[in-house]
Swiss-Prot record:
Matching InterPro entries: ABC_BtuC-like (IPR037294), ABC_transptr_permease_BtuC (IPR000522)
Localization (cell): Cell membrane
A GO molecular-function descriptor: transmembrane transporter activity
Name assigned to this protein: Petrobactin import system permease protein FpuB
Cited PANTHER family: FERRIC ENTEROBACTIN TRANSPORT SYSTEM PERMEASE PROTEIN, FERRIC ENTEROBACTIN TRANSPORT SYSTEM PERMEASE PROTEIN FEPG
Function summary: Part of an ABC transporter complex involved in ferric-petrobactin uptake. Probably responsible for the translocation of the substrate across the membrane.
Organism for this UniProt entry: Bacillus anthracis
Result of knocking out the encoding gene: A mutant lacking both fpuB and fatCD permeases is incapable of using petrobactin as an iron source and exhibits attenuated virulence in a murine model of inhalational anthrax infection.
Main location: membrane
Keywords tagged on the record: Cell membrane, Ion transport, Iron, Iron transport, Membrane, Transmembrane, Transmembrane helix, Transport
Xref: SUPFAM superfamilies: ABC transporter involved in vitamin B12 uptake, BtuC
Amino acid sequence: MNNLQHTLRASLVFGGGGALLLLLFFIHIGQGQANISYSMIIDALISPNQSLEHQTLIMLRLPRAVIAILAGGALAASGVILQTLTKNPLAESSTMGIHSGAYFFLVAATIFLPKGLQINSLLFTFIGGAITALFVYRISGEKKGTPLRMALAGMVVTLMLSAFTGTMQLFYENETAGLFLWGAGSLIQNNWDGVQFSFPFIIISFLVLLGISRKLNILLLGDDVAVSLGEKTAVTRLIAFIAAIFLTAVIVTVVGPIGFVGLVAPHLMRLIGYRQHFTLLLSSFLWGAVLLLGADVAGRLIDPTGAELPVGAVTAMIGSPWLIYLVYRMMKSKQYMNDNGANTAGASSRYYSYKKVIIISITLCIVTIALGVTIGSNAYIESITNVISGQLTQFDKNMMMNLRLPRMLVAAIAGACLAISGLVFQGILRNPLADPSIIGISSGAGVGALTIMYVFPTLPGFFLPIGAFIGGLLAVGIVLFFSWKSGFSPTALALIGIGISALGSAIIQIFIVKANLNVAAALTWLSGSTYARGWNHLENIILYPSLILVLIIFFLIKQLDVLVLGDDLATGLGQPVNKTRLALIVLATLLASVNIAAVGTIAFLGLVAPHLARIVVGMNHQRLFVCSALFGAILLSIADLLGRTIAYPKEIPSGLVVAVLGAPYFLWLMRKSGKKVN
């Protein structure tokens, strides 16, 4: 590249970026419910006075715009460093779980250490982010882990920590009031305190990174070359790691977790041609500021009525497609696609008697439902003895038959259906990581159901499954389209699905804010809950559609025994591969969507139950169908019972209980499959 090209590129990146940032800055401070002209804005900037308009601008709008610039730049710089240290082009604070770790620690401190929070909040977020980053790096295989595997581990850790955080928010609703909007990333500032707090930390950390930029360039040559040149690679990595995590911690402390800025901005600069860290850091800082300020402008343009859209949701809507695009590009490189699609995870060399497994499972399912019906929220043993002795009042009978029994049946049937859906997808895609939540169906169905509720609020409740099905089918269609090129690689498919899930979650957050939905109720539904589910839910939403779908899938499920052998062999045996796969995809999506509409988004159930079934009874899909359904029913019934009783009088959504148990299993499964590959 000659000098003229260098000059043109610098003019475009820094001159054009600076001009765009200035334009967005003036648009941003002109937005708001109070109508302030641009002439008044200029007057307030030059010679401010005590008028309401000037004070609104100086104390509310300007701090918000400045913190957007600082936060965007800091997150972009952090993304550059994380991508360099991990040699992972997908690395960023959100994809590595750093945001969720920092946010989890901060919420915990808000609840349990409120007096020390004001002083130590930055310390809590830094420790949480650092621990999470190291954990993700470890679980993904460290230096042997592929970029896709590392990003997938970060996303799953995010889901797990979000489950813990959501549980705490539901338990301590008063203590965490207002954290929902902030937890989604909010730039709202009521004064200059946030800017004054974050500015010195951001500038010092950024200057440190600029100071070691040459050493970071040498790191890209490899440790052997760097050591031969006299560089202390361990010291450089440690300084860069601390600075990157610290930048993220500062931002989470002030404005909450805002994802994908550190992914998009550095990649834009690399696409333009910047590779040296000094210019890469400077340009990424500038364009990270442009991206976040622009996202906040866009969020306020979407709803100019004054209802705050979390800027984190807007950046997720921008960044999720970018993540999918990057994964799609990386599929061209075989080094990222080194995990095969064989669906043997969970297979064992020793299986148990099928009849004994069925008898034990049915017994356990009945016992679990019976316990759920007889035990109240406080789990008194007297409840059981009263049932056995027949000493029940009319109130007790009504409580058991009209409240607890339908709720437990909803949990059992929904658990069975989600497990069957997961089994079908694992068989169709020959992918041990397939699950309605992992491949995007859960969030897609949630968007579809909320769209019906928001756009058509007067429609009867039985239209919810229709909206959920359309949303779920659209989500799985997008995931399958983009992952087809990789041969439905387990890691790539799961990561694209999680990208779709992030996009769906952002849309759901926007729906919640715009529709003024009850935050606690929304959190409960999004976490997955059978709370207040009665006979009408069982009959109209779950039982009839699910029963029909389950019967159809049962008669088709045997086809999976042939499909898992490979398309060529299945075709040679006379199997209509494409028709069978399409039919099962539609049926499994519809089955999952119907139940998600009833009980909310429950993650990992469709992953865990089929794997447990495979361990017990082997690879025969008709046997797996029955066992997966029973295991799913047992798991969600137990989760519902535990959620009602272990923290009385509070109630934990059953979906959170399943997520807390399922996410570690997913990470173990991914770690195990990674060892086989390596």
